[in-house]
Amino acid sequence: GVWGQGAGESSWQLKGLVDTYHAFRSEKPNDWMSSRTRLRGEVGKNFAGSSLFVSFNATYNALLKERTGFELREAYLDHRQEHWGFRLGRQLVIWGAADGVRITDLVSPMDMTEFLAQDYDDIRMPVNALRFFVFNDKIKLELLAVPTFEGYKLPTDAANPWSVLPKETP
């Protein structure tokens, strides 16, 4: 068990990582495209067919100052029985993604603020949702309620090297 707990008892799981990413444009105007450092933390607890999960990012972004700060990424309760279950809270909803092609994976919006400078998994944005599952060995049915709309984030600030708007040229 974790921290001296016996098998079958509830336990806490702690995980995390630190990563840093920097990109410099080698052609004119020879500027920084991205410069950020992130601490990602994950905390989970399992107990009696249920689990709690929380993940967060603490980020320093040297170029996009408004992106510096703390972000609660996911925070949900997951419960499973033999043939049904539910997940309630802030979560990533991923349906049918395959190597960067999003055919049915359209529930969680994307943060395109630093489009090519982030991993595909990191540009997905969590949604507040209730997911209800019914399943057996042959089929899984999922009902989803997302009470609040959250759309894609597009880089529109002219100071952002990834801006979708045309830059004014002198």
Question: How would you describe each model-predicted region?
Answer:
Residues 44-162:
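Outer membrane beta-barrel
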Residues 32-44:
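Short catalytic helix/loop segments, enriched in acidic residues and glycine
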Residues 6-26, 35, 50-54:
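Transmembrane beta-strand segments of Gram-negative outer membrane beta-barrel proteins
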Residues 1-4, 143:
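Short intrinsically disordered, low-complexity coil segments enriched in acidic
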Residues 3-7, 26-32, 62-65, 117-119:
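Outer-membrane beta-barrel domain signature
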Residues 160-170:
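Surface-exposed beta-loop-beta
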